[in-house]
Structure formats: C-alpha cells, structure tokens
C-alpha cells in the first residue's frame, strides 16, 4: 500500500513538472552557431517584422510553409543573432512563389508547403549552405531536430535574438488524430513532439525544418495553443511526399503532374 502511495506521489510530481515546463520552456536551447547554415528567416517587407523560418535547399530555392505567404517579403540567409550581423549574411527576395495545388490523395492539412525561387543565387559561406532533400521517408520513433526564432513563451510571445534548437520525437499519425479528432482519419502530415510537454515548436517557428536522422523530413506547420502542452504534439508537412513536385519545379516544369 505504501509503495502504491509513493508511486502515485511521484506521478503527480512528474505531471506537475511537465505542466510547469510547458509554461517556461519552448524550443529547447540556443542553437550552435554552426548547426543551422540552411535555416533562413522570412521578414515582411513593409513592417520589417519577422514572420517565419524556412530552409535553403539549393542556391536558388527555399522551402517553407504556405501559411507564411505574404505579398511582399525578404529573406535573410546566414543569420544567427538578429542583433549582430555576420559579414557573410545575404538578403534575397522571392522571384516566384509556388504552392502545392494537387488534390489527389492529399487533404488540405497535407499541403502547407511553399517553394520560393530567389531573385538571384545564394553564395555558400561559413554560415550559409543548403540542406539536401530527403532520400527516404521518415521512420516513426525517430528523434528529430527542430529549430527557429519562434516564441519561447506561450501564449504570450517572447521572440529570441538567437534561434532555439530542440530534439523531439516522431509519432504515428494516429497519436495526433487522437488529440485532434477533427483531423482526417488518414493524412500524410507528420506528428511530432514531446509527450511530457515542455518542448515544442511555436508561433513564428512555422516554415522551419524538422530534421530526422540527418534528413530534412518536415516543415513546421501548426500545433496546439498554448504550445508545448503535455500529450499534444504538433504537425509538420511531410517533405518526402512532395519530392516529385519540388524537383519538377526546380527542373523548370511548373505544370507538374500530381504525385500518387
């Protein structure tokens, strides 16, 4: 009887810690200065407000979330600290934005993806290098890396100068469907997070990468509010299922056939 009571008290302490963590920590620790050379920052042209993250996939293209779209934007590459500029930082503008319009076997939740062609190529440097597209699909159970300049508190926003990085877990889609039952029964979207809470992507992390086993597998799409709640993972657009579309556009075919 005493053992049961002790275990119950430990469980209560564990849950209360997870709930406090979800209020205090979002997005993990500051990223290492050398681990995010592909991470870009999208800004509103007129207000100068930071909007979203994105991923450089070659010298001319950036991949981000479709809901990050705005009529006029500019893109910073090679940035680490918003308040301290590197000599090799580069600024580009969208030449063309591409959106995934296919409907076959894709729900509206699966299509939060935008491919941006830059107005001129980017030069690789000490703080700038592209991240390759995935060569294989992600595996449930993988530990994945997320990063971004998104808010580190929720629901109120506190935006950091330096991007935060964190490790989260990739779950079966059924986990997210159980949390958000209004989602379609089947979806291509990825479900990832930390079930204990306390670590999560949040507002303005949108568009940034989900990197699993060294491969660019997801794009930050959306999640619960407030962020980092226990047992409430977030959702990520699955890059692998859009490979044909991405590669066809890069090759110059803008009237691509929808993938199966």
Swiss-Prot record:
Source organism, top-level taxon: Eukaryota
Domain Peptidase S1: 25-251
PROSITE patterns to which the protein is assigned, alphabetical: TRYPSIN_DOM (PS50240), TRYPSIN_HIS (PS00134)
The EC number(s) this enzyme carries: 3.4.21.-
Secretion signal span: 1-18
Annotated catalytic residues: 67 (charge relay system), 112 (charge relay system), 206 (charge relay system)
SMART domains linked to this entry: Tryp_SPc (SM00020)
Enzyme class name: hydrolase
Known partners and oligomeric status: Monomer.
Name of this protein: Thrombin-like enzyme stejnobin
Species in which this protein is naturally found: Trimeresurus stejnegeri
Source lineage: Eukaryota, Metazoa, Chordata, Craniata, Vertebrata
């Amino acid at each position: 009887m005493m053992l049961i009571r002790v275990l119950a008290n430990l469980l209560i302490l564990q849950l209360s810690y997870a709930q406090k963590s979800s209020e205090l920590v979002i997005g993990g620790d500051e990223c290492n200065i050398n681990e995010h050379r592909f991470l870009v920052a999208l800004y509103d042209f007129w207000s100068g407000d930071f909007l979203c993250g994105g991923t450089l996939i070659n010298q001319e293209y950036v991949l981000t979330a479709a809901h990050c779209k705005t009529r006029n934007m500019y893109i910073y590459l090679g940035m680490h600290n918003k308040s301290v500029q590197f000599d090799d930082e580069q600024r580009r503008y969208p030449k063309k934005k591409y959106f995934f319009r296919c409907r076959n076997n894709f729900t509206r939740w699966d299509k939060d993806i935008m491919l941006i062609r830059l107005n001129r190529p980017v030069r690789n440097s000490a703080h700038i290098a592209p991240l390759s597209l995935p060569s294989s699909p992600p595996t449930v159970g993988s530990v994945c890396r997320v990063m971004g300049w998104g808010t580190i508190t929720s629901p109120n926003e506190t935006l950091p100068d330096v991007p935060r990085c964190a490790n989260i877990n990739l779950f079966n889609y059924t986990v997210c469907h159980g949390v958000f039952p209004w989602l379609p029964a089947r979806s291509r979207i990825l479900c990832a997070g930390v079930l204990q809470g306390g670590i999560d992507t949040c507002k303005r992390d949108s568009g940034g990468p989900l990197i699993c086993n060294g491969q660019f597998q997801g794009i930050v799409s959306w999640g619960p509010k407030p962020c980092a709640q226990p047992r409430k993972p977030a959702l990520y657009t699955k890059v692998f299922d859009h490979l044909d579309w991405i590669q066809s556009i890069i090759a110059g075919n803008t009237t691509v056939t929808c993938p199966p």
